[in-house]
């Protein structure tokens, strides 16, 4: 990669793009630019137990409830806007053109 004695300047050429190994061991890890873990865990650390993992079911249920609420809120706003438009046009004279 880069030696400590190398000075990089704008316009310097690149010999090749840095590559890192990819495996299941890197999933969910925090790594630096040199693909070295910086989260304090070993590369082959065991996965957390099922009990200690956060439940995603509650998050999905909350997200669905929020979506349903927002859809209902949008519908109510549309009804308010359309009724306001009708109310604002109630005093106007309508001319039909044939």
From Swiss-Prot:
GO terms for biological process: ATP biosynthetic process; proton transmembrane transport. GO terms for cellular component: chloroplast thylakoid membrane; proton-transporting ATP synthase complex. The gene is atpA. Belongs to the ATPase alpha/beta chains family. It is a peripheral membrane protein. Its EC number is 7.1.2.2. It comes from Populus euphratica (Euphrates poplar). Produces ATP from ADP in the presence of a proton gradient across the membrane. The alpha chain is a regulatory subunit. F-type ATPases have 2 components, CF(1) - the catalytic core - and CF(0) - the membrane proton channel. CF(1) has five subunits: alpha(3), beta(3), gamma(1), delta(1), epsilon(1). CF(0) has four main subunits: a, b, b' and c. It is an enzyme of class 7 (translocase). It catalyses: ATP + H2O + 4 H(+)(in) = ADP + phosphate + 5 H(+)(out). It is found in: Plastid, Chloroplast thylakoid membrane. This is ATP synthase subunit alpha, chloroplastic.
């Amino acid at each position: 990669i880069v030696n400590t004695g190398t000075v990089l300047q704008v316009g310097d050429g690149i010999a090749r793009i840095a590559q890192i190994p990819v495996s299941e061991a890197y999933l969910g890890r925090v790594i630096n630019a040199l693909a070295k873990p910086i989260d304090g865990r070993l590369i082959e650390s065991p996965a957390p137990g099922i009990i200690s993992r956060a439940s995603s079911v509650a998050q999905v249920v909350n997200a669905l409830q929020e979506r349903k609420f927002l859809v209902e809120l949008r519908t109510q706003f549309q009804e308010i806007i359309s009724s306001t438009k009708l109310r604002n046009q109630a005093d106007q004279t309508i001319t039909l053109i044939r």
